[in-house]
Amino acid sequence: MAAGERSWCLCKLLRFFYSLFFPGLIVCGTLCVCLVIVLWGIRLLLQRKKKLVSTSKNGKNQMVIAFFHPYCNAGGGGERVLWCALRALQKKYPEAVYVVYTGDVNVNGQQILEGAFRRFNIRLIHPVQFVFLRKRYLVEDSLYPHFTLLGQSLGSIFLGWEALMQCVPDVYIDSMGYAFTLPLFKYIGGCQVGSYVHYPTISTDMLSVVKNQNIGFNNAAFITRNPFLSKVKLIYYYLFAFIYGLVGSCSDVVMVNSSWTLNHILSLWKVGNCTNIVYPPCDVQTFLDIPLHEKKMTPGHLLVSVGQFRPEKNHPLQIRAFAKLLNKKMVESPPSLKLVFIGGCRNKDDELRVNQLRRLSEDLGVQEYVEFKINIPFDELKNYLSEATIGLHTMWNEHFGIGVVECMAAGTIILAHNSGGPKLDIVVPHEGDITGFLAESEEDYAETIAHILSMSAEKRLQIRKSARASVSRFSDQEFEVTFLSSVEKLFK
């Protein structure tokens, strides 16, 4: 009897849910239609706003070209791409209106332009309008201690919405890797959209790190020790990679900065027909006046590291390798060696990392041989590179490595990480001659530094010449040609 009652209750429950199916379907359909109507209405309003903004004083419509670069005043390699891209477009489309969306609200537009000239020696030939965004904190990694990728990506949508509400461009280019803004500007703003990808937000390498339960700057130790948490994170990464691929595929033009980035973007976005490699512009010409022969202004050798103070740059590895080099006395007495870190700090988190690096050098007893130069002018950077014997780079799977190219152009012998762009595109043989060195572990770096310093001056000069000859393909001029060719589709 009880079994019969349970069966009757189950049938009744199924009939109840079945009766709700069609009404639920109608409600969902109605809500979807309403959402489409609202979004379409917003799009129409934005189109009217666009026409008002793009009309000049003489009544003619002007094309509005906007770059989304929330950290345009940071002074890194990504910012050099931004300013060179703007300069190239202004040469070809001088009548257009140029806009940069930025979150650098603590400075004004003139100060940003002066900073670009001071750091990169770039001065634009036409005016640029800056749209200052107040919600940049939504894309700060410090706001999301967990689910950082998802948090920053969702935050970029709100930041993109703020940008779109202030200015609706004809052409939108994301030059900083915020792919989740692409569908917003394409389908709501009605813009032609392009993207320059420095580094995929997620990559198959990141999936491998979690799958193999390896510790990394983006994979905490407590997760690697727990198989269940590792599986949960792996599922989260796969879902995020799928969504990242969907939003990235909205781009009408995709530019990537290296072979390594190309392989990952083709795998994730699957838009090979509109994806091209556009090597980032490196100010090769500026460094060519540095003599290749070794200067002996001061005794000993100078080692330099050029790059922003971000966790993925792995600066601690350089200090540990340097300490190992000194402690094992692989080279001459310590006073003859000095390691100088040169880079930009974007925010308080970067400043905190610099302080942590200072403490690490103190803990290892090498603080008197290590210096930090923060946000220094371009001329000062050039002076350091002119005196350096070795340039250090330790980022695993660096997307490209503008700092690596600058070191090679300046005549510094580069010692880079054996992965990513440096391995595939930069530190490669030129006409059969080596152009630099690659390493991975702390021991590798220490031994290779010792090997370079033990070479004769003539051998080092030969490597310098080959390296300098090889980097002409990364010049500003080459960038302008390939960039303009790639974005041409956006202006048709």
From Swiss-Prot:
Chain ranges passing through the membrane: 20-40
Intramembrane segments: 234-254, 400-420
Subcellular localization(s) per the UniProt record: Endoplasmic reticulum membrane
Gene3D superfamilies documented for this protein: Glycogen Phosphorylase B (3.40.50.2000)
EC number per UniProt: 2.4.1.131
One example of a Gene Ontology biological process annotation: dolichol-linked oligosaccharide biosynthetic process
Protein name per UniProt: GDP-Man:Man(3)GlcNAc(2)-PP-Dol alpha-1,2-mannosyltransferase
Species whose genome carries this gene: Pongo abelii
